Amino acid sequence: MEITDVRLRRVETDGRMKAISSITIDGEFVIHDIRVIDGNEGLFVAMPSKRTPDGEFRDIAHPINSGTRAKIQEAVLAAYEVADEPAVNEESSADESVVEEN
């Protein structure tokens, strides 16, 4: 599995979310709404999730092994570090910056 494209949009919120990302896997499959979160021990990647009726959050898509999770996190955080556009307000419709990985 190779991450062939990362699109990232920085957001400015009062919370800990710093960016929203989409990744393309092998040029054939896209996962949207991957979030970059500023956690207690630094930045980390949160997979897309949905709130259940009982208030619990469940991942919609997620890697099933630690190696794949590491690949996704490394690719998204690398795109976050090189994104040179300024943060935008979450409500605005800014274009996404694109970082391609091969």
Swiss-Prot record:
NCBIfam families: PRK13259.1 (NF009749). Keywords: Cell cycle, Cell division, Septation. Pfam families: SpoVG (PF04026). Could be involved in septation. InterPro entries: SpoVG, SpoVG_sf. It comes from Listeria innocua serovar 6a (strain ATCC BAA-680 / CLIP 11262). This is Putative septation protein SpoVG 1. Belongs to the SpoVG family. The gene is spoVG1. GO terms for biological process: division septum assembly; sporulation resulting in formation of a cellular spore. Coiled coil: none annotated.
